[in-house]
Regions:
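ER/Golgi luminal nucleotide-sugar-dependent glycosyltransferases, focusing on the catalytic module
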Residues: 1-310
C-alpha cells in the first residue's frame, strides 16, 4: 500500500469537521496567526511560509507539505472541497461541483472519503487524480460573456487582481520555466478551467509542480499591489496549477482520473445527535427545493440575482 497523504487546508477561525483516516492530513492554514490550542497540525513548523497565508491562501499548506512531509502521493483539498471517490455521478452546480449542505458521516460514506482501501486502489492506478474541468464561460465575473479561459480570468481584473497580472505571469513563465510556456498559451486559449487547487499526484509530479509554482508566485508578490489585491498570488497559483496539469496531460501524456469535486456549504462540527438529524432533514428539504428553483432561477442568471435582492 502506497503512502498517500491528502493535505486538507483548514481555517484557523472555524472548527471544521475532519475525515479521520490515515490518508487525510488536516493542516491549519496560516497557523502562525492562530492563538488557540488546536490539536490540528499547523503550517508554521519546519520550513514554512505560514505568514503569507493572506496572499498565498491554501498554498501555504501545499508548501509545508512539500518541505516537511515525505509521501508517495501528495494531495491537496480544502476544508469545504473534497474529491469524490464514488463511482456514481451526481448532479453538478454551475461551477461543476457537487453541492452538499454539511460534511457528516453520511456524506463521508456517500463519497467514500472514509474508505482508505478504495482510495489507495484508485490513486495507485494513475499519475494524477484531478477534478473534472469546468466551462470557463460559466465562471466569469458577473456572468460576462467569455469564450476562453483567458477571457474568464480577465473578467476578474480589478476584482481579484490588478490589470496586467496575467501578462506578468506569462512573462515570468517564459523567464523562469520556459518549457511550460506553450502549454500555458494553449491552456489559456481553451474553453475549460481546472479550478480550486484540489488534486492528488505522484511525488515526482508534486515536487515539479511546486518548483514551477512558488518561484513565480513569489515574484508576483514582489511586483503586484497586494495591499489592494491581497490574494492575487493565490489566484496566480491556481492558474499555474491548471497550466501544470495541462502540460502533464498533453505533453507528457501522464495518466489521470477525473473525478467530481464536492463542495460542502458548512463544515462546522456537529456536536449532538439532534443536530445531526436536523442537518439531514435540512439537506433533504434543500435538495427538493433546489430541484425546482434552479430550473426557474438558473445559477447567476439576471432573474436569480433580482430575486436575491428582494
Amino acid at each position: 500500500m502506497s503512502n498517500i497523504r491528502i493535505f486538507v487546508s483548514h481555517r484557523i477561525d472555524i472548527d471544521s469537521e475532519t475525515v479521520d483516516t490515515p490518508v487525510y492530513f488536516p493542516v491549519r492554514c496560516g497557523a502562525v496567526y492562530d492563538e488557540s490550542n488546536s490539536e490540528i497540525q499547523g503550517d508554521d513548523t519546519g520550513d514554512n511560509i505560514s505568514k503569507l497565508r493572506m496572499s498565498f491562501c491554501e498554498f501555504t499548506v501545499q508548501y509545508w507539505a512539500w518541505k516537511n512531509v515525505d509521501a508517495d502521493y501528495y494531495g491537496l483539498c480544502h476544508y469545504r472541497r473534497y474529491l469524490s471517490f464514488s463511482d456514481k455521478h451526481y448532479n453538478n452546480t454551475a461551477f461543476n461541483m457537487v453541492r452538499e449542505l454539511r460534511l457528516t458521516a453520511h456524506e463521508k460514506k456517500k463519497y467514500h472519503l472514509d474508505d482508505t482501501q478504495r482510495i489507495n486502489n484508485v490513486v495507485q492506478k494513475y499519475d494524477m487524480i484531478i477534478p473534472v474541468v469546468a466551462k470557463a464561460s460559466e465562471m466569469s465575473y458577473n456572468r460576462a460573456e467569455v469564450k476562453t479561459l483567458r477571457e474568464m480570468w480577465e473578467s476578474y481584473n480589478g476584482v481579484y487582481f490588478e490589470q496586467g497580472i496575467i501578462d506578468n505571469m506569462f512573462s515570468l513563465i517564459k523567464e523562469l520555466s520556459p518549457e511550460y510556456y506553450n502549454s500555458a498559451c494553449e491552456y489559456f486559449s481553451g474553453e475549460y478551467h481546472r479550478a480550486f487547487n484540489c488534486y492528488i499526484m505522484k511525488k515526482e509530479l508534486f515536487v515539479r509542480m511546486c518548483e514551477f509554482q512558488f518561484p513565480i508566485m513569489n515574484r508576483i508578490m514582489e511586483i503586484t499591489d497586494c495591499k489592494t489585491y491581497e490574494r492575487a498570488p493565490g489566484y496566480i497559483g491556481e492558474m499555474l496549477n491548471g497550466i501544470f496539469i495541462h502540460y502533464m496531460l498533453t505533453v507528457e501524456n501522464r495518466s489521470a482520473k477525473e473525478t467530481q469535486l464536492v463542495f460542502f456549504v458548512n463544515t462546522e462540527k456537529i456536536n449532538s445527535a439532534k443536530e445531526y438529524y436536523k442537518c439531514r432533514i435540512h439537506a433533504v428539504a434543500d435538495k427538493a427545493v433546489r430541484s425546482v428553483a434552479d430550473k426557474i432561477f438558473p445559477m447567476y442568471s439576471p432573474r436569480r440575482e433580482k430575486v436575491k435582492k428582494l
